[in-house]
Amino acid sequence: MLKKEDRAMGYVENIEELIEGLKFDENGLIPCVVQQHDTGEVLMVAWMNRESIKLTVETKTTWFWSRSRHELWNKGAISGNIQQVIELYSDCDNDTLLAKVDSPGPACHTGSRTCFFNKLV
């Protein structure tokens, strides 16, 4: 059982229970919006499965499921720009996640700080 101060630090007592309340798509995936915790800047959107959520909660770093490579990946593990998870939320329908992170460098594979740089309107 976790102590009160552990819960206040964001530790999760039962990861399975947390995951069971989420709504995954037919492929077992759920979208996750990644946001810089202190500025509110939206950095990227990626997909998570049950295992990547567990790893994210356990390691306090972002883990995602690559739909193209069909494998788990720890964001920033290769570039060194590992995203530290500050908070993780689900939306009102429990079908989308929001990870508030501290992202030390570019979040986009193009080298841009954010993946959202193609202004449409």
Report residues per predicted region:
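C-terminal binding/interaction regions
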Residues: L2-L29, Q36-L43, M48-V121
